[in-house]
Amino acid sequence: MLGVDEIIQTIKMIQEENLDIRTITMGVSLLDCAASDPVAVCDKVHRKVTRLAGRLVEIGNEIEREYGIPIVNKRIAVTPVALIIGEMGRDGCLALARTLDRAAAEVGVNFIGGYSTLVHKGFTRGDRELIASLPEALAATERVCASVNVATSKAGINMDAVRLMGAVIKETAARTADRSAIGCAKLVVFANAPEDNPFMAGAFHGVGEPECVINVGVSGPGVVKNAVARLPDADLGALAEEIKKTAFKITRMGELVGRETAKRLGVPFGIVDLSLAPTPAVGDSVAEIIEALGVEACGAPGTTAALALLNDAVKKGGAMASSRVGGLSGAFIPVSEDAGMIRAVAAGALGLDKLEAMTAVCSVGIDMVALPGDTSAETIAALIADEITIGVVNHKTTAVRLIPVPGKRAGEFVEFGGLLGRTPIMEVNHFGAAKFVHRGGRIPAPISSLNN
């Protein structure tokens, strides 16, 4: 039984510490929407998405009112569309992107993910058409999010895809230059992409998933920070225990909301993603947890160790609370979406090199990082390759969301608005790797991949 003090503590988490459900994401399979006629594909996709997700926002709002738990976003993830486009060509891909955007608007969700492809071992014709369409699709739509999986720990790294994505990111930035290159904020490059991730912009509905499913992403950096702050003299082992207990409570709440949403919609419940997802709001920062643990500023020596402690404790606490843990499940460090990280970059405490080191021990990777507008496509590709390699070698998901902002230089600020926040432009090493990137081919999988 819950004690009165635990109930009061949970209410305080919601009212004072920014605890919320970050997203309820409905996964929808589009595999039965394939057809030889692009018009027929778009029609099938539109009808299926609007039919299955038509009540998602309504049900989410109902649960929010009944339980008093804020649910920030309701979203949709679909099958990677490269699997259904067949011979549609680039124009067909763009028509499908507009169809997804229209369907998302009609059901009232703010993002729909799955304009995606998996090319870790090579390209089909459809993969190439979809990747070529990305800059225009992301510029022409408001709600569509895209992702490209360029590597796995079993297959190695497709460097041809990495090189291509460097150029795609540059073109996407140019096409949305009047909106601070916002198109790049909706594009993720993955290694070991999960099939059940509820968070945008990298969500898609994997081929091993059911026809329709509800996945939930929780939040709560502010709750964890306050838990740490209540123990100013505790050793690190005691702090890890306190973080585990806090993560347990957060995860239980997420599972409650996920199961109730799935029940009311008549679809299966999938997973709870344990990720601590920050926002630009004061007191809702992963960087501030690191600082509460005793690191003077996020990025200072000790940051990577503190982040590893946090990430591990969150996973252990969450795994005790639910048998349905999935997605990314760790601590997110998106620079523009975390008030503490924004301050650390502006103060010179946190740079790209340290950020890359941090990604080796936490969830996702180099995320929402704004770069100078004159950063070359080859340098962007090399940054992607470095980050993707961390994921491949360590058998974990890593991802890259880089935003080269046209006309901006290192140290200047860029505003994205909303949950995407604002950030200083980060300085990039002025030495290049163009020859390495243009060699192409595939970087073989590590020997640790041979584990059967």
Swiss-Prot record:
By its UniProt entry, which Pfam families does this protein fall under?
Answer: DUF711 (PF05167)
Gene3D superfamilies associated with the record: 3.20.70.20
The protein in question is named UPF0210 protein Daud_1353
| Coiled-coil stretches | none
Describe the subunit structure.
Homodimer.
Per the similarity annotation, which family is this?
Answer: Belongs to the UPF0210 family.
NCBIfam families given in the database record = PRK05313.1 (NF003700)
**Signal peptide per UniProt:** none
